[in-house]
């Protein structure tokens, strides 16, 4: 009998990796003669460890300081495609400040957060910390100018109510609850418009030992992204695919704002460079010299896939 090529994929159960869910659910992988063995992991850091060891082939990963530390150590893996991108404007992640500070005029802008307590879920080196560090840099400050508090998102509302924090980086539904509760107001939004904060990676083993499979996987993955553009995002076949892998409800997905994906899953190099630079300047990486692009990224699979698929037609 004809057997399918098996590819083991690590994923964190969030909508950022929707093209993969759809590529499987709508049989684009099967069309490419691939069977995907999905392995749920707790974090991108965990996924990268498996990829570096070659025990898993593909991973959906959020970029953090740990990502760059792994590349610096020479981990055998590469970014091959973008996953969800930050919106160009009206992004869900915002910086909220205590209403009393805004009302009194003590905090009018990001620059006024100097010396103040700012809560970020997960603390230093996270994607959230990147947003805050980038906003501070643009205001002429560094992350060292604030007191960072590592606080889980659900705990932030109470911290605002008690006056235990001055500001926080937070997203829905918590941001809406804090503002709705009257103790916090919006200070900044769209700190990194269009940023590529989540990516798909291949293991060195897959690239070296099965380059053909890696290329076919990419064809299916890009088809998955193209199938969820614009209004198609909520097609019933897509919803069914999302719900197989994400802990959510159809209602919540319909109500929530759609994640943004490049139809070609293009890798945004300037985005990677900017994140790496900000993480380095904040001393969240354990090295000081920029990592060469070819040690982090391999664009050849997407390029080959696009030759087969042709340009995206909305």
What are these regions (language model features)?
Residues 55-58, 161-165, 258-274, 303-311:
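Short amphipathic alpha-helical segments at helix boundaries and their inter-helical linkers
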Residues 154-244:
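Pocket-lining segment of extracytoplasmic ligand-binding domains
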Residues 208-289:
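Secondary-structure end/capping motifs
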Residues 25, 52, 56, 72, ...:
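Sec-exported extracytoplasmic/periplasmic mature domains
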Residues 2-150, 166-172, 185-194:
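Short, glycine-/small- and polar/acidic-enriched structural segments
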Residues 17, 21, 48, 64-67, ...:
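Extracytoplasmic/secreted envelope proteins and their assembly/folding machinery
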Residues 277-314:
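Conserved C-terminal helix/tail region of periplasmic/extracytoplasmic solute-binding proteins
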Residues 41, 47, 69, 88, ...:
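Short secondary-structure boundary/hinge segments and terminal tails
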């Amino acid at each position: 009998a004809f057997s399918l090529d098996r590819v083991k994929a690590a994923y964190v159960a969030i909508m950022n990796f929707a093209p993969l869910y759809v590529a499987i659910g709508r049989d684009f992988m099967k069309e490419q003669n691939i069977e995907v063995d999905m392995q749920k992991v707790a974090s991108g850091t965990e996924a990268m460890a498996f990829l570096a060891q070659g025990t898993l082939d593909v991973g959906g990963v959020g970029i953090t300081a740990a990502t760059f530390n792994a590349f610096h150590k020479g981990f055998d893996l590469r970014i091959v495609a973008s996953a969800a991108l930050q919106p160009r404007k009206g992004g869900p992640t915002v910086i909220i400040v205590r209403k009393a500070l805004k009302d009194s005029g003590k905090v009018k802008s990001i620059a006024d957060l100097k010396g103040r307590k700012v809560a970020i879920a997960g603390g230093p080196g996270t994607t959230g910390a990147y947003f805050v560090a980038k906003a501070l840099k643009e205001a002429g400050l560094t992350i060292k100018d604030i007191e960072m508090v590592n606080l889980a998102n659900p705990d932030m509302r109470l911290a605002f109510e008690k006056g235990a924090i001055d500001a926080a980086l937070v997203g829905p539904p918590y941001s809406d609850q804090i503002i709705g509760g009257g103790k916090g107001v919006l200070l900044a939004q769209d700190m990194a418009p269009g940023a590529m904060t989540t990516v798909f990676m291949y293991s060195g083993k897959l690239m070296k030992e099965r380059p053909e499979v890696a290329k076919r996987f990419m064809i299916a993955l890009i088809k998955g992204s193209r199938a969820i553009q614009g209004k198609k995002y909520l097609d019933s076949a897509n919803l069914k695919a999302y719900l197989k892998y994400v802990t959510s409800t159809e209602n919540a997905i319909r109500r929530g704002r759609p994640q943004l994906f490049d139809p070609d899953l293009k890798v945004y190099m300037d985005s990677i460079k900017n994140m790496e630079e900000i993480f380095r300047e904040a001393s969240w990486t354990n090295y000081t010299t920029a990592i060469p692009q070819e040690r982090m990224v391999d664009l050849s699979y997407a390029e080959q896939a696009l030759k087969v698929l042709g340009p995206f037609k909305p």
